[in-house]
Amino acid sequence: DFYDWGVGVGLGVLRKLTVPGMLSEGSYHDYIPETYRLLNKDYCWLEAYHFTKSVMEYFKASETFATGVVCGSLYDSRLIRTEPIYNNIFYGHDKMKPVCGATVELLQAGAVKYTYTTDQLFNGVYMFKDVEPGKYTLKVSHPEYDAFEQEVDVTANNVTYQNLALDRTRSTAPEVVKYSPVWKEG
């Protein structure tokens, strides 16, 4: 991007650099759900990973990453965020409450290869880095949610995104509290 604001050509924050530089506008910290995701170091690592790939592409590097990445976020399938901090401004699955403290496993041929526990920072983010290419089973467990499994294909030099809606485990038996019509004797 080049702009002429009367003080020289170029973006102001990059104008006086003496080395190559990049400006990150990959996320919006004033969008509250994104703010919570940015608290997760692995989520921030992903932006650096994409920067690295873009530099490699720009300079037509012959090498690529031999491994892949599996990442995403876990959220409740029914519970909607209601905290006043959100001002009812959220989109897509960001409307749903993230799942904190879930254990996410990546299995290959039934053996656990990688394990990740989602943090308590209300973002539901999980990530597996440097995953060898191949077919895996993504397994999610949490005491308050039904177990979840899904097959994923990991390819070299790519990110496999899996945002997952989890169903809360019902802990109380259903109870009839009212019915109609009411039966009357006589």
Q: Where do the PLM segments sit?
A:
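A short, amphipathic beta-strand motif
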Residues: 68-76, 164
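Short, acidic Ser/Thr/Gly-rich low-complexity loop/linker segments typical of extracellular
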Residues: 97, 106-125
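Hydrophobic beta-strand segments
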Residues: 100-106, 138
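Compositionally biased low-complexity segments at domain edges in trafficked proteins
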Residues: 166-186
